[in-house]
From Swiss-Prot:
It comes from Nautilia profundicola (strain ATCC BAA-1463 / DSM 18972 / AmH). It holds the Pfam family Ribosomal_L11. This is Large ribosomal subunit protein uL11. The keyword Ribosomal protein applies. One or more lysine residues are methylated. The keyword Lyase does not apply. Keywords: Methylation, Ribonucleoprotein, Ribosomal protein, RNA-binding, rRNA-binding.
């Protein structure tokens, strides 16, 4: 018989840096999950994505076991890294804080494609171009 799903948790944790302190510890502890087991598994799975915040979806079962799925880093993090900036513009219409090329945009779109609600790379590029525009990042040819 299949295990009964009790809850699905969504967290954003820095890659390779999950530890029992907040927000991870309290979120998992109150659901009876072995926190250290999750931290070790998450850190092992995300060690090659250091420097990014990784969205993770944790499925908790009735017998206190769990599974988790890691997603790609947020589009904003990927765009900031491609543009070489620390943060987006506070006024994106007036202040442009960085530039990325269409090739860089395509690279980010290919990385983010599994998490977007499209299968077309051109459509994914349009979605990410909108995010870049709202961050004050200019797209050049």
């Amino acid at each position: 018989m299949a295990k009964k799903v009790v809850e699905v948790l969504k967290l954003q944790i820095p890659a390779g840096k999950a530890n029992p302190s907040p927000p991870v510890g309290p979120a998992l502890g109150q659901r009876g999950i072995n926190i250290m087991e999750f931290c070790k598994a998450f850190n092992e799975k995300t060690k090659d994505m250091m420097g990014f915040t990784i969205p993770v979806e944790i499925t908790v079962f009735s017998d206190r076991s769990f599974t988790f799925i890691t997603k790609q880093p947020p589009a904003t993090d990927l765009l900031k890294k491609a543009a070489g900036i620390q943060k987006g513009s506070s006024n994106p219409l007036k202040d442009k804080v960085g530039k990325i090329t269409k090739a860089q945009l395509k690279e980010v779109a290919e990385k983010k494609l599994p998490d977007l609600n499209t299968d077309d790379i051109e459509q994914a590029m349009k979605i990410l171009a909108g995010s870049a525009r709202s961050m004050g990042i200019e797209i050049v040819d």
